[in-house]
């Protein structure tokens, strides 16, 4: 019997990272404050999850100044998009297989 959990990507196990990638799959670029408001996360919590996704090379970070204010934006990389689609496919397959057993 195949273990369907093998295809679940650990980088997307948390609700926060799943939310971050979901937003970035819909929007090309999103700034820190927009992610924070939409996902209802604290600055520190969001920053740590963004850092983990950046280290996995699933997101790209762009820092710039708008006037005198810093602005950080995030976007999903191609490898991040691929990994996220594969994760969603694995979840879907897991759900479908569990429904067959009912």
Regions found by a protein language model. Give the residues of each.
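Amphipathic alpha-helical dimerization/coiled-coil segments
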Residues: 2-5, 22, 81-102
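Basic, amphipathic "hinge/linker" alpha-helix immediately C-terminal to the N-terminal HTH DNA-binding motif
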Residues: 66-87
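N-terminal helix-turn-helix DNA-binding core of bacterial DNA-binding proteins
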Residues: 3, 7-45, 66-67, 73
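Glycine-centered, phosphate/nucleic-acid-interacting loop/turn motifs that mediate DNA/RNA or nucleotide
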Residues: 57
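Residues within the DNA-recognition helix of helix-turn-helix
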Residues: 49
